[in-house]
């Protein structure tokens, strides 16, 4: 008998995730290097226009006739390729029992993702559960506002090169206070170090380390 869930989260590598709702809606977040034959998408969301987050070839593989492609207003020109819908940061998009909100995501110290680009983090909500995909970001003040949003699962970059290292990423988790934190965009680092750090900083936050294409997390 399969486990019941409101959201099922599967890591596809890099910053790419497949999220399914309990009602069978299939959402892809930042799909990249997607294999042929993967399950088609109801909704695809890209956090920003860098090729490893808005990957046209992967998006095309996941498209069906009624797939909806979403992203922040700042990548409207990219979205046109798929007749996509831009969303203003802070606004939400509702689809059946699903709510999608885009919030700021940017670098503070590094030059790769400036705040002025108005790129996005993504919050998906369904059935009283939520998943936050931080996009390519560093620790930013807006994250502290997420502590009031009761995030179930936070997907946090920790590769260090273009985003955060383990120390900063775990600080973000402490700011956000999700029930579960999942490290991503990790560039083959030992993710157990992320787990050890966060367990010391806030043992109330559970760390789940997903395997690429492995068993998904059900919440």
Model-derived features: where do they sit?
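Active-site metal-binding motif and surrounding structural segment of the metallo-beta-lactamase
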Residues: 28, 32-77, 148-155
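Active-site environment of divalent metal-dependent phosphoester hydrolases
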Residues: 35-36, 50-54, 76-79, 91-94, ...
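Divalent metal-coordination and catalytic microenvironments
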Residues: 19, 48, 100, 136, ...
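Core dinuclear metal-dependent hydrolase active-site scaffold
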Residues: 1-39, 85-148, 211-219
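Metallo-beta-lactamase
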Residues: 123-176, 183-190
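Short active-site oxyanion
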Residues: 7-8, 63-68, 129-131, 179-181
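Binuclear metal-ion centers of metallo-dependent hydrolases, dominated by the metallo-beta-lactamase
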Residues: 8-9, 83-95, 170, 174-219
